[in-house]
Structures are given as C-alpha cells and as structure tokens.
C-alpha cells in the first residue's frame, strides 16, 4: 500500500513525517548505511521531542532510508578524540541522550528495520519498544572491533532481552545475526518480507492507536522502572503525578490553596 507521508519539518540528515497519527523519523544517510553524526542525532532528538509534544501523534516509527540499512551506528569518519565531532568541532556522544529520550517518551516507539542494524544502530533498535524486521535485516555489535563499546542500554538492557549468555556472545564475538536468528533470541517482535515491512509496522501502530494512551504510557513506564532504577521510577512517578493532576481530588487541593481555605478531602473515596 502506498501512503502519503506528510513532511512535518525539514532537516538535513533525517526525515520527519506524519501519517494517520503516526510519526516516522527516518535517518537519511543511505550513502553511509545511515550512520549517524552528532548533527543526525541532534536532529533526531528534536524530532522525537516534537513528536512527544504533538497531540496528533500516538505512535512513533524509527527507521533508516532505503532497504540496505536501518542504521550502522556512529559514523567513524567523524569520530575524534573523545567522541564524534560535529560542525561545532566538539566531540560528543549525544546518542546517549537520544537513547534515554526514546526510553522515556510516553508513546510507543517502533523500530522498522530493513538491512543492517549494526553497532549503535542495533542499540537504537534495542531501546525501541517494539521491532518489526524485514527478512533482510542483519543485527550485531562491532564495538570491540573498532575500539568502542556501549556499557549502558546496549549491553545491560540487551542482556535483559536476550539473556546474559547471548548478550556476551553478541558483544564478545561481534558476529552478525539474520532476522530469523534475531527473532529466535527475542531481539525483534516479528519478521516479514521486505516489501511488507512498512505495511506491517503501520498495522501494529494502528492497533496501538486504538488503545488507551494513558494505559500504554503507564505500561511503558512500569517496564522501564524494572530496568532503569531510580531514573525509571522517576519516569513512572512523573506520569502518575500528571494523571493525578487531572482528578477532582488533586483539583480540590489546588483550589483550596488558591482560595485560602482548608481542603475537603473527606469527600473522596479511600479504596482498599
């Protein structure tokens, strides 16, 4: 099915589009297998932030331009002393900020993977809530081969997903795994033919759109809290506070303060 994706905002190294309440963030550097630079990452952070705040958007897709690669990680050509160097000549690892944003954004984020998801690209796949993989997808880590590693979500959370033994294999041996192998280890949710991957991804997104956004928000926060320690608890607590602010009980406390009177909390139920 051909869809008319609407461009929401123009960027240099990514695309940011909208279709039927679904945002799509596309890394647009196919000439380098969608490897990212600090500028690519900053643009993705901006797009994801806008998607978080946009009331039209229920679900977000992350993908790469073309059929050959989802993302091949950081562009080694701009890797300098202490990080990846952008236009400002400051070495950065701002992809860590993007990883955290994908984790805490209160909307489902779905990785749509075609071709290579390697290195930092595989880590982006890992931190997404769900993954729809094309049958040509290839996953793996390369860090120890190129003098790098991800000791955060890319290893610790990966181990939660595929098990510690498998995660160590992935990192220690730096092998590549096809789509079926990724499915078997729980790294992706489903595998479909390449020409059907967008249809399947959009179908999953449309199914989630039919469900309670508050329920999905809290489920995401709860699962994150299990793995993210106090940072995860902070996310869930913040979501709970926002929900509480919408209740008559919370409004009674606010209004009583503004009206300089004692609040009447006795009127509200005390559920067991």
UniProtKB/Swiss-Prot annotation:
Its EC number is 4.1.3.36. InterPro entries: ClpP/crotonase-like_dom_sf (IPR029045), DHNA-CoA_synthase_MenB (IPR010198), Enoyl-CoA_hyd/isom_CS (IPR018376), Enoyl-CoA_hydra/iso (IPR001753), Enoyl-CoA_hydra_C (IPR014748). Keywords: Lyase, Menaquinone biosynthesis. One of its GO terms (biological process) is menaquinone biosynthetic process. It is an enzyme of class 4 (lyase). The record marks 84, 245 as: Important for catalysis. Hydrogencarbonate binds at residues 141-143. GO terms for cellular component: cytosol. Residues 253-272 are annotated as: Disordered. Its cofactor is hydrogencarbonate. It holds the Pfam family ECH_1. Pathway: Quinol/quinone metabolism; 1,4-dihydroxy-2-naphthoate biosynthesis; 1,4-dihydroxy-2-naphthoate from chorismate: step 6/7; Quinol/quinone metabolism; menaquinone biosynthesis. GO terms for molecular function: 1,4-dihydroxy-2-naphthoyl-CoA synthase activity. Residues 253-264 have a biased composition (Basic and acidic residues). Substrate binds at residues 33, 72-76, 84, 116-120, 142, 148, 245, 260. It catalyses: 2-succinylbenzoyl-CoA + H(+) = 1,4-dihydroxy-2-naphthoyl-CoA + H2O. Belongs to the enoyl-CoA hydratase/isomerase family. MenB subfamily. Converts o-succinylbenzoyl-CoA (OSB-CoA) to 1,4-dihydroxy-2-naphthoyl-CoA (DHNA-CoA). This is 1,4-dihydroxy-2-naphthoyl-CoA synthase. It comes from Staphylococcus saprophyticus subsp. saprophyticus (strain ATCC 15305 / DSM 20229 / NCIMB 8711 / NCTC 7292 / S-41). The gene is menB.
């Amino acid at each position: 099915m051909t869809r008319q994706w609407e461009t929401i905002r123009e960027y240099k190294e990514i695309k940011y589009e909208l279709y039927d309440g679904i945002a799509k963030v596309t890394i647009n550097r196919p000439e380098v297998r969608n490897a990212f630079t600090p500028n690519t990452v900053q643009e993705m952070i901006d797009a994801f932030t806008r998607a978080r705040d946009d009331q039209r958007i229920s679900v977000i897709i992350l993908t790469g331009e073309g059929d050959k690669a989802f993302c091949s990680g950081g562009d080694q050509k701009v890797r300098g002393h202490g990080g990846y160097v952008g236009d400002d000549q400051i070495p950065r690892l701002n992809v860590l900020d993007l990883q955290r944003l994908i984790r805490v954004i209160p909307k489902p984020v779905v990785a749509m993977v075609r071709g290579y998801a390697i290195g930092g690209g595989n880590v982006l796949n890992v931190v997404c809530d769900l993954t729809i993989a094309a049958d040509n997808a290839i996953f793996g880590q390369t860090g120890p081969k190129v003098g790098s590693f991800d000791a955060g979500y890319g290893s610790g959370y990966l181990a939660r997903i595929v098990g510690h033994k498998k995660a160590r294999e992935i990192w220690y041996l730096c092998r590549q795994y096809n789509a079926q192998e990724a499915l078997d280890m729980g790294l992706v949710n489903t595998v479909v033919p390449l020409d059907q991957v967008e249809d399947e991804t959009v179908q999953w997104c449309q199914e989630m759109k039919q469900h309670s956004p508050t329920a999905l928000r809290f489920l995401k926060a709860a699962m994150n809290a299990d793995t993210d320690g106090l940072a995860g608890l902070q996310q869930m607590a913040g979501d709970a506070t926002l929900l509480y602010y919408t209740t008559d009980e919370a409004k009674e406390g606010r209004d009583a303060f503004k009206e300089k009177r004692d609040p009447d909390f006795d009127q509200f139920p005390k559920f067991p």
